[in-house]
């Protein structure tokens, strides 16, 4: 049975339809999740504030956000201007097939840690776990249909968890500057959100905001 012959009522067809739905609407879902997180920070304060756990979470959070930002910029150098017309298999894409999403997870967990709330971090991690496997499957299907060499690339390269022994760089690489510049904004938004998260904490400490709930 070919892909085009799979009926929407077939289990594989239903799974593909769900994958496509989550892929199309992931930005909207993230907006809802981020709104929930910001509301939690507006009305809640961490139970760990003032304990040794607080600076630990903040440090881990800053590390995660920093790695995510640098990693996304590294990916953007390789993928900018090539996303739909070239199968990029070197640099970060030699380590795994979806390094951008690895960076997203690092940034999401980093932001969660910076809220100093394990509950908020768990919500962010759950949202990622529910959506991004579907996004990865959808993108893999597109790449398989667009590039005959993808099958060999997928055979040797893990989808998500990087394998450092596979790293292969380039001595020279042409960067699509205009496309890379557009991708810079997409790569640094974790930094912007981290500033917002810390601002809520500062406002609570200064008494500008009053917490009505304690965040675990």
From Swiss-Prot:
The chain crosses the membrane at residues 27-47, 50-70, 116-136. It is found in: Cell inner membrane. One of its GO terms (biological process) is response to cadmium ion. The keyword Lipid metabolism does not apply. It is a multi-pass membrane protein. One of its GO terms (cellular component) is plasma membrane. Keywords: Cadmium resistance, Cell inner membrane, Cell membrane, Cobalt, Membrane, Plasmid, Transmembrane, Transmembrane helix, Transport, Zinc. One of its GO terms (molecular function) is transferase activity. Pfam families: PEMT. It comes from the Bacteria. Component of the CZC cation-efflux system that confers resistance to cobalt, zinc and cadmium. To A.xylosoxydans NccN. This is Cobalt-zinc-cadmium resistance protein CzcN. The gene is czcN.
């Amino acid at each position: 049975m070919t892909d085009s012959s799979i009926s929407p009522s077939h289990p594989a067809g239903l799974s593909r339809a769900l994958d496509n739905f989550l892929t199309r609407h992931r930005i909207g879902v993230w907006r809802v999740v981020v709104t929930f997180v910001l509301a939690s920070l507006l009305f809640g304060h961490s139970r760990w504030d003032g304990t040794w756990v607080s600076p630990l979470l903040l440090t881990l959070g800053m590390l995660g956000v920093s790695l995510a930002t640098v990693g996304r910029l590294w990916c953007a150098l390789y993928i900018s201007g090539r996303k739909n017309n070239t199968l990029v298999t070197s640099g970060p894409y030699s380590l795994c097939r979806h390094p951008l999403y690895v960076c997203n997870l690092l940034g999401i967990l980093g932001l969660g840690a910076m809220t100093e709330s394990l509950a908020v971090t768990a919500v962010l991690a759950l949202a990622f776990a529910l959506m991004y496997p579907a996004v990865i499957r959808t993108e893999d299907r597109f790449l398989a249909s667009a590039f005959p060499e993808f099958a060999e690339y997928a055979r040797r390269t893990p989808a998500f968890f990087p394998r450092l022994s596979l790293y292969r760089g380039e001595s020279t690489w042409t960067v699509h500057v205009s496309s890379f510049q557009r991708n810079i904004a997409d790569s640094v938004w974790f930094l912007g959100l981290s500033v917002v998260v810390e601002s809520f904490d500062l406002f609570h400490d200064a008494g500008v905001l009053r917490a009505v709930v304690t965040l675990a």
